[in-house]
Amino acid sequence: MTLAEEFRSRNFSIYGQWTGVLCIILCIALGIANIFTIHVLRIVFSVLCLVSGLVLIFIEVPWLLRICPTSSKFDAFIRRFTTNYMRAVMYAIMSTIQWLSLLPGSGASSLIVAAVFLLIAGLFYALAGLKNQEFVGSKTLGGQGLVQMIV
């Protein structure tokens, strides 16, 4: 299945996964960009955004668990997020954390962009769950075809 066919399938988990890839890029970039500030609270939220981006890499690109040396506890933690609802909850939590970066003392920052896109990805996964769509991983990002080729 090509990338265009995946998008035409109208499976919201595919949309969620690709929005998640965008979230990875945004979380890592914005986490690094906002860490250089004098506001201590913003530094904390920047680190949380950076950690979120790194966790999302392993969740959204499954073949990385096979090629990167990680602990069995970390692998078990990542494998919890295989359903649409679990991913929706995870994205909602990550988004809420970034929305909290607007608290007084931290000031408004570009971390809000990460919060918005994390929320959108969570909504895609929630819609997939509500429509009873099975979680389908993109073949481009390491769906069943690529994982079987690596093994």
Swiss-Prot record:
Keywords: Glycoprotein, Golgi apparatus, Membrane, Transmembrane, Transmembrane helix. Its main location: Golgi. Signal peptide: none annotated. It holds the Pfam family Cg6151-P. One of its GO terms (cellular component) is Golgi membrane. The chain crosses the membrane at residues 21-41, 43-63, 88-108, 110-130. InterPro entries: TVP18/Ca-channel_flower. It is a multi-pass membrane protein. GO terms for biological process: vesicle-mediated transport. It is found in: Golgi apparatus membrane. Glycans are attached at residue 11. Golgi membrane protein involved in vesicular trafficking. Belongs to the TVP18 family. This is Golgi apparatus membrane protein tvp18. It comes from Aspergillus clavatus (strain ATCC 1007 / CBS 513.65 / DSM 816 / NCTC 3887 / NRRL 1 / QM 1276 / 107).
